[in-house]
Amino acid sequence: MSDLYAHRILILDFGSQYTQLIARRVREAGVYCEIHPYDMAESTLRDFAPRGIILSGGPASTVGETAPRLSPLIFELGVPLLGICYGMQVMAAQLGGRVEVSAQREYGYAQVYVHGHSRLLQNIEDHTTAGGEALLDVWMSHGDRVIGLPEGFKRIAATAHAPLAGMADEKRRFYGFQFHPEVTHTRQGIRILERFIYDICGCEALWEPRHIIAKSIENIRTKVGADTVLLGLSGGVDSSVAAALLHKAIGDQLICVFVDNGLLRQGEADQVMATFARHLGIKVIHISAETRFLEALAGVIDPEAKRKIIGRVFIEVFEEEAAKLPNAQWLAQGTIYPDVIESAGGKTGKAQVIKSHHNVGGLPEELNLKLLEPLRELFKDEVRQLGTELGLPFELVYRHPFPGPGLGVRILGEVKKEYADLLRLADAIFIEELHAHDWYDKVSQAFAVFLPVKSVGVMGDGRCYDFVVALRAVESVDFMTARWAHLPYDFLDHVSRRIINEVAGISRVTYDISGKPPATIEWE
C-alpha cells in the first residue's frame, strides 16, 4: 500500500469560512492535507514537513498592529506558498510590501486580467479581450488590498479595483491571489489549485478511497485492540459508512446501538434493522426511547439547547448500554468534517460558531466512554466514496443527509409527539413524490419542516385552523454552500395537495427559496 501521507499540503487557517473548502479541493486532487491555525507551533510545522503551504483567507484586516501574523519560519522552509485573500495580504505585508484598506471593497463575481508569464496561470483562461489578454471569472470577498509588491514579486493578475489581484515570486515559488480559487464560482479555480499542488509542489495523487480504508482499518485496530465498540447508528449515510468501516476492521467487536428517539423519519426503524442486522450481518441493538427524549425536550424552544439535550440523552443511553456489555470502552460516531466546521470544533477553532452539532457540541465534558470518530477528517463526498468501496448499496450511500438530532431540528420551537407525527407523514409524502418523479437524485437534500404556527384554511365548506409545513430542497456539491432547488410548480402543487388532503392537522404548505449562505440548510 502506498503511503497516502507521503505527499501532503499544509493549510494555515486565518478564520475563513472557506478554509475547509480549500482542504476539500486538495483532497479531491488526491493529496492529503491538514488544517492548522496560522500560529501553529514551529516544532509542529517542521514535523509536518509539507510539500506546500496554502494560507487561507480570514475576516481580519492586515492593517494594524493586532493583525494576525505568520511565523517567519513559514518563509524559510523552502516550500511553495499560496496565499488566498488575507493569505496574500499577510504574505505581502510580512515580506516588505504594502497593504491598505480599500475604498472600493469587492464582494462577489469579478473578472481578473492575467498579466505576464506565470507558471501558476500559464494557459489558464475563461475569455480573452480584444487585445488578446486572458480573463478569468472569479469570486472576490475582501476589504483590504495590496498596493505595493514585496521585493522579488511581480504582478500576475489585476481587476478594475485591485491592480494587484495576483502576485508571484517564481524563484521562491511564492504566489498570492486576491480572489478565491477554492469556490465553484471561480471557474478555473480547481485547475489553478491543481497546478499549484502537482506542478509547483510536486505532489502525487495518493489519497484514494482504497488507501484511506486500509489506513483507517489499521488505525482502528491499533487504537481499539480487543475492546468492544458501540456505534450510534442512525441509518444516515455517515453512521452507515462508519458501521461498515468498523465492521470490516473489528468484526464482532462492533455493536451498533440504534436508538429510536421518536424523531426518526417514517418507517426508518424497520429499514435500519433490515439493512444492517439482516442483510449486512452487523449486530444491532434496538432501543425504543421516544418517551425519554420527548420528556427531556419538553418546554425547550432554543435550537442550540435542543441539540445539546438530544446529544446528552444519546450519550446517556449509550453509557447505560455499555454497562451491560463486557469490554465496551468506545463510543463510535459518524462525525464528519462539515459537522466539525459548523461547530467551530476543528483544530483551529478560529471560525465563528454557526450551530453546534449533536455529535460535537452535545458531548458532555466527562465522557465515560472513549470517543472514536473514524470519519472525522472526511468530507461528505469522501464518505460516499468509502461507502461505495466498502460495498454498501447505492440507495443507502446516496441517501439524502439526515441530521443527528433528527426531526428535533426540523420542528421549530418545542418538540411534541403530535408535531413529530404530523411532520413524519408530510415528509414521507414529499420524499415519495421526489422518487416517483425522478427528482430525488437530482437534488442534494430534501425534507419537510414543521412550523409551530397555525393558519386559517377552508376544508370542504368549513373553516379550519391548522398547522403549516415548509418544504426544503437544495442543490449542493459540498454542503458548504447550496442553492434552493427549482422544482417545477406543477410538482410542488401536487405535493402540497397531497399533504393537505392526507395529513389531518396541516392546512398550508410553503416552499423555502433560501440559499446557503445566508440561510443554513437545516432550519435549526
Swiss-Prot record:
ATP binds at residues 234-240. One of its GO terms (cellular component) is cytosol. Pfam families: GATase (PF00117), GMP_synt_C (PF00958), NAD_synthase (PF02540). Residues 207-399 form the GMPS ATP-PPase domain. The active site is at 85 (nucleophile), 180, 182. Residues 8-206 form the Glutamine amidotransferase type-1 domain. It is an enzyme of class 6 (ligase). This is GMP synthase [glutamine-hydrolyzing]. It comes from Nitrosococcus oceani (strain ATCC 19707 / BCRC 17464 / JCM 30415 / NCIMB 11848 / C-107).
